[in-house]
Swiss-Prot record:
Subcellular location: Cell membrane
One Gene Ontology term from the biological process aspect of the record: cell wall organization
UniProt-recorded Gene Ontology molecular function terms: arabinosyltransferase activity
Gene: embC
Entry protein name: Probable arabinosyltransferase C
Cysteine pairs bridged by disulfides in the record: none
Organism of origin: Mycobacterium tuberculosis (strain CDC 1551 / Oshkosh)
Enzyme class: transferase
Any Pfam family: Arabino_trans_C
Family indicated by similarity: Belongs to the emb family.
Length: 1094
């Protein structure tokens, strides 16, 4: 409808208006509405409290009756309770000189792990004592001689959330103890001292003695399924709610009005604007940038089927996503077909098209005649919608379904107001509740219901005269609560409450008054505050401001329907306020406004037309504000997250083409403001013409009077062209667009087919021409370059802290994401040229000489000219088109060069040319300098390195190894699709063929590899997954040693694509533990123990 219809006058149309006189035809409907509605609501509310079948898991050790280490990394870090009994004679294997290397009788973490003592339990020999250490606390200690004596019987240990206790049964405290003669025992309480468990490890071997026992109750509270009682209640609850809604519909039809079309008559027709919007959305589906959390959500969805529930895979100790996980469950089902990006995001594309259809077919006509008939309104609505959707909603996050849910909730409410019927209200409650629980940002959907309370109360009051209140309210109550059934279908009330309390305690859990952080990020020169995101939000705020201003000044925007337009404005304002209560403050949350942005754009377009805003001065001022918004938006980078940024123009700088765009737009703003001043002081008429304008002049005037439409479509064009240009400029190298288009042909493994892995860098070393291998690196000239001229610690510099990241600090207060194996160190044995530097990437010190310019104390100028190294033949160069030098230090790329020569030139001591290396990596850590072999003439047969360090600052130094030509294989070929991987959450969507490690019954699978994003991404996402947040990094760093493998991006050799790490267990022979499984029925209020929080 174009305008808001007045509710029918029921008292006139229906002579009998009392409840007592209701017709017999509606008496049954009333009874069904009351009974079914109330019972449906009760069953829905009771669903979280009904019992579930929980799968229990017990970790018992020894297994197979032997001292054999086993792996069992608990996703919740700790067991609900732990009981250990160790016969004293079991410690005999630690005594004697023959057992010097054996120190651990039993531990829950490998002793070699850096944080083993801080986090785990170790029963170990320390000098001549046997010590039980629990989370860095020596709980009980006894001399090993007494432990092996005749009086000692056993060591017992128990751990619960409130206390841990241990006792050497048979031993007493010594004469110098606080309580001489008392039992030798220790206890700690007042804190959760339960040790982290990643397995059971021992240095001993052979048969286990009788009485040795380790029993841990694994926390499997979320590994549950509904009991038959709960399943029956849920089915009955849904059926009763459906019956109540049917009864409500029957009561609605008592008004005597004919049935109205569910969809408008022109719903399926398309016009030119529709075609353009469809084309933009479909093309963006292939070439457009994705959101930062797509890999996070895809990995959760892929793992959930095997796990049995939708766990938060990367944080919060494996607690479930519920009550916000139902949308992810749909993605998990969708992933059964394919995990390729174009397939997984197909629902998002469908939501985008549906949003536009709802805006153009439902929203715009309801906003009034002026909006419905204005082409400027339609174009502005389309531009605003696309301007928000493209940068914020082209991924797997829940913002797209929330944006659609808000629109559908509003449309249902408007249909209820227009028809004076209550079934649309019930439907709005269902849609609103599903939207609310799609994600934390779903809280924005409550505005669609709140703004209609007044009209709906009037409808309820009128209809209650005939049917009473309860038959009308009960079905709505059932509709509002029925969403509890899918949300709590396999989980309990107590479990969800504890999970959400844990998330709030662990964080990030920012308060409402921290909302400024979201806007700080919006105005940073980063992907969070990119041109596209900043403009989307600023344009939305501008449209809201002008709509509110015109509504307040004139009562309503001329030509619009007052009720619907006020409600759409009210929803937007409430949504902004509701966003303050989300626990995190990221700019991608603004994606929930995509549908509202299109609706407000239509209103704003009408508000600034000549018919509504007659003053040319005011219209010109509005145009100036629009240009200023553009200028403010272009004062940022055209940046996107991770791989979406590859090849994008101005991705790391402000846009500039001969001159700065933001400066030019600011100057244009001033010119438009001067024009507004001229209209105010000189030509102060209202600009109306008496003569009939020509068709061309009318069209030109319409365009000029639509500055917001022009700006939004310019931004949409800028975004689409930028990402299309990125795909073209990158070709044949990898890009998002190329990968998605190739997926149509069946090549669905994404980046894994283009990342080239160098497993053995020693195989590609170039052979020296004349000098021995050990001396060739310094054979030409070596002044102040020495084999040990490298600091012991070359850890990469950390990035700066960013707003809101304080929740993600590691134990040292830094935000880092360094690549293990590249941070340096020293070795006990010297290498081939006497260097003790620890080399990265599996380089063999016995075959790899090292020279560096650093020295302790005062630095001196240093120069290096290596001997000549033989290049391979031209045919071999074509197969491996890259030359690499592993280097460390802080230096300018001009200070390290590669020179080439023919045999004759080298013999004469001359070179035929030189080039700089591309320095890809983080200083001063070890990294691979790259040079394309195509830049070396085909006649060249030899190369050498030249380094010049004239900077005497202690932090400025150079360390080099000999040149090599990598022998590479694709990551897909090396890692494959079978090995369990630790996929960082930024990379999940780019590697759809790799299998993320799973978890089941509270125990994680042990990964063999880890894939990280680029340096910026690794430093941003690694702290999210660490021990403090209950993520998988807190497990892998205790269980395995990570080593970075050299890798390169095909045809984009100078790109920091990310990193591949090999994960090697500290105990290579440890096998996955066998769990003792069982099933038990638990009530919805049952809790085994508090969840671990620190």
């Amino acid at each position: 409808m174009a305008t808001e219809a007045a509710p029918p006058r029921i008292a006139v149309r229906l002579p009998s208006t009392s409840v007592r006189d209701a017709g017999a035809n509606y008496r049954i409907a009333r009874y069904v509405a009351v009974v079914a509605g109330l019972l449906g609501a009760v069953l829905a509310i009771a669903t979280p409290l009904l019992p579930v079948n929980q799968t229990t898991a017990q970790l018992n050790w020894p297994q197979n009756g032997t001292f054999a280490s086993v792996e069992a990394p608990l996703i919740g870090y700790v067991a609900t309770d732990l009981n250990i009994t160790v016969p004293c004679q079991a410690a005999a294997g630690l005594a004697g000189s023959q057992n010097t290397g054996k120190t651990v009788l039993l531990s829950t973490v490998p002793k070699q792990a850096p944080k083993a003592v801080d986090r785990g339990l170790l029963l170990q020999r320390a000098n001549d004592d046997l010590v039980l250490v629990v989370r860095n606390v020596p709980l009980v200690t006894a001399p090993l001689s007494q432990v092996l004596g005749p009086t000692c019987q056993r060591l017992t240990f128990t751990a619960h959330a409130d206390r841990v206790a241990a006792e050497f049964v048979g031993l007493v405290q010594g004469p110098n103890a606080e309580h001489p003669g008392a039992p030798l025992r220790g206890e700690r309480s007042g804190y959760d001292f339960r040790p982290q468990i990643v397995g059971v490890f021992t240095d001993l071997a052979g048969p286990a003695p009788p009485g040795l026992s380790f029993s841990a109750s694994v926390d499997t509270r979320y590994s549950s399924s509904p009991t038959p009682l709960k399943m029956a209640a849920m089915i009955l609850g849904v059926a009763l709610t459906g019956a109540a809604l049917v009864a409500l519909h029957i009561l609605d039809t008592a008004d005597g009005m004919r049935h109205r079309r569910f969809l408008p008559a022109r719903w399926w027709s398309t016009g030119g604007l529709d075609t353009l919007v469809i084309a933009v959305l479909v093309w963006w589906h292939f070439v457009g940038a994705n959101t930062s959390d797509d890999g996070y959500i895809l990995t959760m969805a892929r793992v959930s089927e095997h796990a049995g529930y939708m766990a938060n895979y990367y944080r919060w100790f494996g607690t479930p996503e519920a009550p916000f996980g139902w949308y992810y469950d749909l993605l998990a089902l969708w992933a059964h077909v394919s995990t390729a990006s174009i397939w997984m995001r197909l629902p998002t594309l469908a939501m985008a098209l549906t949003c536009w259809w709802v805006i153009s077919r439902e929203v715009i006509p309801r906003l009034g005649h002026a909006v419905k008939t204005s082409r400027a309104a339609a174009w502005t609505a389309a531009g605003m919608f696309l301007a928000v959707w493209l940068p914020l909603d082209n991924g797997l996050r829940p913002e797209p379904i929330i944006a659609l849910g808000i629109l559908l909730t509003w449309c249902s409410v408007e249909r209820a107001v227009a028809t004076s019927r209550l079934l649309p209200v019930a439907i709005a409650c269902i849609i609103g509740a599903l939207t609310l629980f799609s994600g934390p940002t779903g809280i924005a959907s409550i505005g669609a219901l709140l703004v209609a309370i007044g009209p709906l109360r009037t409808i309820l009051h009128r209809r209650s005269r005939r049917f009473g209140v309860l038959p009308l309210v009960a079905p709505i109550l059932a509709a509002a609560t029925v969403t509890a059934i899918p949300i709590f279908r396999d989980q309990t009330f107590a479990g969800e409450i504890q999970a959400n309390l844990l998330k709030r305690a662990v964080g990030p859990s920012l308060k409402w008054f921290d909302e400024h952080i979201r806007y700080e990020r919006l105005f940073m020169a980063s992907p969070d505050g990119s041109i596209a995101r900043r403009f989307a939000v600023l344009a939305l705020v501008l449209a809201l401001a002008v709509s509110v201003a015109m509504s307040l000044r004139k009562g309503r925007i001329p030509g619009t329907a007052a009720g619907p337009s006020r409600r759409i404005i009210g929803i937007t304002i409430i949504s902004f306020l509701a966003m303050m209560f989300t626990p995190t403050k990221w700019t991608h949350h603004f994606g929930v406004f995509a549908g509202l942005a299109g609706s407000l754009g239509a209103l704003a377009a009408v508000a600034v037309t000549g018919a509504a805003m007659r003053s040319r001065r005011n219209r010109t001022v509005f145009a100036a504000v629009v240009v200023f918004v553009l200028a403010l938006s272009f004062a940022s980078v055209n940046g996107w997250w991770y791989v979406s940024n590859f090849g994008v123009p101005w991705s790391n700088s402000f846009p500039k083409w001969r001159w700065s765009l933001t400066t030019a737009l600011l100057e244009l703003t001033v010119l438009v403001l001067l024009l507004a001043a001229w209209f105010h002081f000189v030509a102060n008429g209202d600009g109306r013409r008496t003569a009939r304008p020509t068709r061309f002049r009318a069209r030109l005037a319409g365009i000029v009077q639509s500055p917001l439409a022009i700006a939004t479509w310019l931004l949409v064009l800028f975004e689409v062209v930028s990402l299309t240009q990125a795909m073209i400029s990158q070709y044949p190298a990898w890009s998002v667009g190329r990968s998605n288009l190739q997926a149509l042909a069946g090549k669905t493994c994404g980046l894994a087919e283009d990342v080239l892995v160098e497993l053995d860098p020693n195989a590609g070393m170039l052979a020296p021409v004349t000098a021995p291998l050990a001396d060739a690196l310094g054979a030409g000239l070596s002044e102040a370059f020495t084999p040990n001229g490298i600091p012991a610690d070359v850890t990469a510099d950390p990035v700066m802290e960013r707003p809101g990241d304080r929740s993600f600090l590691n134990d040292d207060g830094l935000i880092t994401g360094s690549e293990p194996g590249t941070e340096g160190g020293t070795t006990a044995a010297p290498g081939i040229n006497g260097s003790r530097a620890r080399l990265p990437y599996n380089l063999d010190p016995a075959r790899t000489p090292v020279l560096g310019s650093w020295r302790a104390g005062v630095q001196v100028p240093a120069m290096l000219r290596s001997g000549w190294y033989r290049l391979p033949t031209n045919e071999q160069r074509d197969r491996a088109p890259l030359l690499v030098v592993t280097a460390a230090g802080r230096f300018d790329s001009r200070e390290v060069r590669l020179q080439w020569a023919t045999d004759e030139q080298a013999a004469a001591g001359h070179h035929g040319g030189s080039m700089e290396f591309a320095d890809v990596g983080a200083a001063p850590a070890w990294r691979n300098l790259r040079a394309p072999l195509s830049a070396i003439p085909s006649t060249a047969t030899q190369v050498r390195l030249v380094a010049d360090d004239q900077d005497l600052a202690p932090q400025h130094w150079i360390a080099l190894t000999p040149p090599r030509i990598p022998r590479v294989r694709t990551l897909q070929n090396v890692v494959g699709a079978a090995d369990p991987l630790f996929l960082d959450w930024l990379v999940g969507l780019a590697f759809p063929c790799q299998r993320p490690f799973g978890h089941q019954y509270g125990v994680d699978e042990t990964p063999k590899w880890r894939i990280l994003p680029d340096r910026f991404g690794a430093e941003a996402n690694s702290p999210v997954m660490d021990h403090n947040g209950g993520g998988p990094l807190g497990i892998t760093e205790l269980l395995m040693r990570a080593t970075t493998v050299a890798s390169y991006l095909k045809d984009d050799w100078f790109r920091d694509w990310g990193a591949l790490q090999r994960l090697t267990p500290y105990y290579p022979d440890a096998q996955p533990a066998d769990l003792n499984l069982g099933t038990v029925t638990r009530s919805g209020l049952w809790s085994p123990a508090p969840l671990r929080r620190g």
